[in-house]
Curated annotation (Swiss-Prot):
Disulfide bridge positions per record: none
Classification via Pfam families: Bromo_MP (PF01573)
Alphabetic keyword roster: Host cell junction, Transport, Viral movement protein
Species this protein is from: Alfalfa mosaic virus
Organism ancestry: Viruses, Riboviria, Orthornavirae, Kitrinoviricota, Alsuviricetes
Subcellular location: Host cell junction, Host plasmodesma
Biological processes annotated in GO: transport of virus in host, cell to cell
Name under which the protein is recorded: Movement protein
Keyword Transport on entry: yes
Gene Ontology CC annotation, any one: host cell plasmodesma
Function of the protein: Transports viral genome to neighboring plant cells directly through plasmosdesmata, without any budding. The movement protein allows efficient cell to cell propagation, by bypassing the host cell wall barrier. Acts by forming a tubular structure at the host plasmodesmata, enlarging it enough to allow free passage of virion capsids.
Protein family membership: Belongs to the alfamovirus movement protein family.
Length: 300
């Protein structure tokens, strides 16, 4: 069977051109394209990781086309000949979500698949805890026409995030990974829910209290005394949490022996001897000026 197409100009048949397309040749070309996409040299799983999607609190939904640039390039080249007989399959879709907010916060993530050609929606998860890391795994149970995918009417991922944190702050990061395949055969599968695999939080970094690193940190910022030949030996650190008590304040009453004197507009601080017989330990005839002259500036 042959399909004949003729192009004629308005001036007549003199400038016309005709060509024949063999149906068998079309099918042979479609088979070759399908085989190329399933060759072992390309790997059994042609997974694509495009980029990371940062999900912002309350921002507009993020929309990502799940057709790789390689497949779009093939579609644009082959569409005039076999585009009507080719399909795009999404046999594997993985969505890795990593939260950016703490467990003490709250939020939810909505993920959907949208077939722009048909207008249909498939729920991946409509109320995922934004504080929980996980991997979603699934597939789309129908084929996308190659001619629709070439025009941009393909399968799209739609993600929206809402949290109790500041507006437009990063709630989490989503890493979409998928496998798209060109084939001349359609798929007809029973729709199934996406699987969700939670990711547990890890333990704190083991060398957080590494004595050697802390010693190096101190030595970089501390000048050793004169005559020091050896570095201080590291000791085992035992972190302790202790609630400090309320600070005690000693007030010195004004009187004849303690005049209210200031220097340059600021009242100087005096060390009090709490073990003196009078409790305050302020000698008779004490003045701030004499204290500064005798104790703080003895050589002046």
């Amino acid at each position: 069977m042959e399909n004949t197409k003729t192009n004629a100009s308005s001036s007549g048949m003199s400038s016309s051109s005709s060509f024949s397309v063999s149906y068998a040749e079309e099918m042979l070309l479609a088979d070759e394209v399908s085989k190329i996409n399933s060759m072992s040299i390309l790997g059994p799983n042609q997974l694509k990781l495009c980029t990371q999607l940062v999900l912002s609190n309350g921002a507009a939904p993020v929309v990502l086309s799940l057709v790789s640039k390689e497949k779009k390039s093939i579609l644009n080249r082959m569409l005039p000949k076999i585009g009507q007989r080719m399909y795009v399959h999404h046999s594997a879709i993985y969505l890795l979500y990593m939260p950016n907010i703490l467990k003490s916060s709250s939020g939810s993530i909505t993920l959907k698949l949208f077939n722009e050609a048909t207008g249909e929606l498939v729920d991946v998860d409509t109320d995922h805890d934004a504080t929980q890391a996980c991997i979603f795994a699934g597939r789309y149970p129908r084929s996308i026409l190659a001619k629709d995918a070439a025009k941009g009417h393909d399968l799209k991922l739609v993600v929206h995030a809402v949290a109790s944190t500041n507006a437009n702050s990063a709630v989490g990061v989503l890493y979409p990974i998928w496998e798209d395949e060109l084939s001349r055969k359609q798929i007809l599968e029973r729709g199934a829910d996406f699987l969700k695999f939670p990711i547990a939080e890890t333990e704190p970094v083991r060398d957080l209290l590494n004595a050697g690193k802390l010693t190096d940190f101190v030595l970089d910022r501390t000048r050793l005394g004169v005559g020091s030949k050896n570095d201080p030996s590291p000791v085992l650190l035992e972190p302790r949490a202790k609630i400090t008590g309320k600070a005690k304040t000693v007030f010195i009453p004004e009187g004849p022996s303690v005049p209210n004197t200031t220097i340059n507009g600021m009242a100087p601080t005096v060390r009090i001897d709490a073990g003196s017989p009078k409790g305050l330990g302020v000698p008779k005839g004490f003045t701030y000026e004499s204290f500064i002259k005798d104790e703080i500036l003895p050589d002046h």
